[in-house]
């Protein structure tokens, strides 16, 4: 077979692997041969450049078939042309535990043209369609089977809930206009507006009556800061003045214009809207903090408390805000306690659980219930790798931390782990230099881990393939299940020597910035281990009399850390040694930190409560960053200490 022929894509790979079955007894000792490593290294490098002919040619030279199947998987999930519906569906059936199943199913649906109805109907009974085309094809099948009511309901749901191009909108409307109702157009328009899809919403305006159209035009004006916004809002009929979407966009418009008093006036009277609780929650979080900064804690509390969220990060943040404001600004510990208990009860992750428990302890202590407070502090301190657990550990009377030994998998468990197909494939991909492709397979394995030993084996696998970022990720996953893998979760790579910044702090920041992935590049352009922006790095390099090289930020670990160490040292100097301020400045920039000091005071002074100052940071990313770095710092000091160790977070906050 000529795998390099014109038009070859995943079809060739499927042919090569057809009929090959991986023996379940292959052990860890069975590694890729030198020749296979060379062949697959070239194949995956070619695939990364979308040169599928070269990828097939190189892969055909290898003897071990499993990485070739991964190459086939990559071609399908990348949307490479050529794979038939039958090929893709067979791959899905044969690899049900492989990652990115939705992408595989999407590829199958995109290849369904010409597939017989009976074949598709059989497939859809086990795999509900996920694409617009797939759902509409299923609706047509239902219509042909006499299931018109169900078919029409599905068509309407697709119209209302799908993000469509202008071409697809016209096509669907022309084909199903007799099924779609005015009410469906109104629901679609409302969804598009809530999702800020301006262009799509404008296209739908002619399809809705005058009242909803006036509301939509006003909302679009508010979203886009149109010059005639007041006029558009004024043209909304009185019967639509209480439209939740219109009120939401008016609040958001005022907030974006820094018209905070006006935004607060609307927000405090906003009606309950559980359907769009997530959007409202964002405004409530922002405006509650602004109200607090304006010296209006009573308003801030009302805004935070009256949310419609029932779970998730927004629920946790608003319950915390309501409790914190009640405790620290309104002197209402009983009210605060109820919110903190709700936060604790809803928590599923160590940080949230520790946060709820610590602050419930603070509220109980304020109420005079010392034993209850101590119990809550004990509960928080059990999550000793978290910021709030470490704060709780310094509370008077808290039970000393007891470290539990790390899991030690037996040889039986190790051998069973090594026999797993995805474990072997992860090793093979790493050996072939396919690091980007390793990640989804590793994460899929993590999804299946349920025991301490399995989490430990995943962390060891990451270390074996020299992926400290995945080792940290495995340890974090373990912590969510109550398993602490300290050595694995807090790697200690060799760092360049230098003064000014303690090694535990440097490690703590690097763990948070990149999880030790030296080639990491953020969406904003920050690069390398310490996620340095090129402009900042160039200034530091000049000050150190080093030649600046953007490439070296992601290829030379020592170079990146040398510059990062110098930068954090400068920040510490500029902020008189304050860890809180320097860490915040590393994330958000010194100028913003100085702005926050003007708003919330100087946390280095005795008159400012530094714990409250950290909670007051208006940027969630920076607030989280400061807390995560400080908690990492304690664990790295623990790892590097040669004598007895006690958490010093409370004093680190004040330094």
Residues covered by each model-derived region:
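N-terminal leader/linker segments that initiate helical-solenoid repeat arrays
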Residues: 29-74, 402-422, 431
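Structural motif corresponding to the intra-repeat A-B loop/turn of tetratricopeptide repeats
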Residues: 49, 78, 82, 115, ...
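Alpha-helical positions within canonical tetratricopeptide repeat
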Residues: 54, 83, 87, 100-103, ...
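Catalytic glycan-binding domains that act on GlcNAc-containing polysaccharides
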Residues: 65, 73-74, 89-90, 94, ...
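Solenoid-like repeat scaffolds
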Residues: 30-33, 56-66, 77-80, 89-99, ...
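Residue at a conserved register position within TPR or TPR-like alpha-solenoid repeats
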Residues: 46, 79, 112, 142, ...
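Bacterial N-terminal signal peptides
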Residues: 12-24
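TPR repeat positional signature
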Residues: 39, 67-68, 72-75, 105-108, ...
């Amino acid at each position: 077979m000529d795998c390099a022929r014109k038009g070859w894509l995943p079809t060739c790979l499927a042919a090569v692997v057809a009929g090959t079955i991986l023996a379940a007894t292959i052990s860890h000792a069975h590694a890729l041969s030198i020749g296979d490593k060379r062949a697959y290294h070239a194949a995956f490098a070619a695939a990364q450049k979308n040169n599928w002919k070269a990828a097939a040619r190189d892969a055909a030279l290898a003897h071990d078939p499993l990485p070739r199947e991964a190459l086939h998987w990559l071609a399908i999930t990348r949307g490479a042309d050529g794979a038939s519906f039958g090929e893709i569906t067979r791959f899905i059936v044969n690899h049900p535990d492989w990652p990115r199943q939705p992408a595989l199913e999407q590829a199958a649906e995109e290849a369904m043209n010409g597939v017989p109805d009976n074949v598709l109907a059989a497939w859809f009974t086990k795999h509900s369609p996920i694409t617009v085309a797939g759902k509409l094809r299923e609706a047509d099948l239902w219509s042909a089977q006499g299931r018109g009511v169900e078919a029409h309901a599905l068509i309407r749901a697709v119209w209302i809930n799908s993000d469509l191009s202008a071409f697809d909108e016209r096509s669907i409307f022309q084909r199903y206009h007799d099924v779609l109702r005015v009410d469906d157009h109104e629901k679609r328009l409302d969804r598009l507006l809530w999702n800020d899809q301006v262009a799509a919403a404008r296209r739908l305006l002619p399809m809705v009556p005058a009242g909803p159209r006036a509301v939509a035009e006003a909302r679009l004006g508010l979203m886009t800061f149109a010059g005639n916004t007041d006029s558009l809002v004024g043209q909304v009929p009185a019967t639509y003045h209480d439209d939740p979407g219109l009120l939401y966009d008016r609040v958001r418009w005022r907030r974006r214009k820094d018209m905070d008093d006006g935004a607060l006036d609307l927000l405090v009277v906003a009606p309950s809207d559980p359907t769009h609780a997530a959007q409202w929650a964002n405004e409530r979080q922002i405006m509650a903090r602004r109200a607090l900064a304006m010296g209006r804690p009573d308003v801030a509390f009302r805004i935070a408390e009256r949310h419609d969220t029932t779970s998730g990060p927004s629920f946790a943040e608003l319950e915390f805000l309501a409790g914190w404001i009640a405790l620290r600004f309104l002197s209402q510990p009983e009210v605060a306690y109820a919110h903190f208990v709700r936060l604790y009860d809803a928590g599923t992750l160590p940080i949230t659980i520790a946060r709820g428990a610590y602050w419930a302890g603070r509220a109980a202590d304020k109420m005079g219930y010392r034993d209850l407070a101590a119990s809550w502090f004990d509960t928080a301190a059990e999550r000793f790798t978290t910021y709030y657990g470490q704060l709780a550990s310094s509370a008077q009377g808290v039970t000393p931390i007891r470290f539990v030994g790390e899991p030690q998998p037996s040889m039986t468990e190790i051998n069973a782990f090594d026999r797993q197909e995805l474990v072997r494939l992860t090793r093979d991909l790493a050996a072939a230099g396919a690091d980007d492709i390793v990640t989804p397979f590793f994460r899929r394995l993590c999804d299946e881990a349920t025991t301490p030993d399995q989490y430990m084996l995943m962390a060891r696998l990451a270390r074996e393939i020299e992926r400290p970022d995945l080792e940290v990720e495995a340890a974090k996953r373990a912590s969510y299940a109550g398993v602490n893998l300290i050595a694995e979760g807090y790697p200690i790579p060799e760092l360049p020597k230098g003064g000014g910044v303690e090694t535990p702090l440097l490690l703590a920041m690097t763990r948070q910035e990149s999880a030790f992935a030296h080639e990491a590049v953020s969406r904003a352009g920050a690069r390398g281990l310490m996620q340095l922006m090129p402009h900042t790095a160039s200034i530091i390099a000049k000050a150190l009399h080093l030649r600046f090289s953007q490439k070296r930020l992601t290829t030379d670990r020592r170079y990146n850390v040398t510059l990062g160490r110098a930068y954090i040292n400068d920040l510490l100097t500029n902020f008189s040694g304050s860890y809180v301020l320097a860490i915040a400045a590393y994330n958000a920039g010194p100028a913003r930190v100085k702005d926050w000091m003007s708003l919330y005071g100087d946390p280095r002074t005795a008159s400012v409560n530094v714990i409250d100052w950290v909670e007051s940071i208006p940027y969630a990313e920076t607030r989280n960053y400061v807390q995560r770095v400080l908690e990492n710092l304690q664990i790295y000091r623990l790892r590097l200490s040669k004598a007895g160790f006690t958490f010093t977070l409370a004093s680190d906050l004040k330094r």
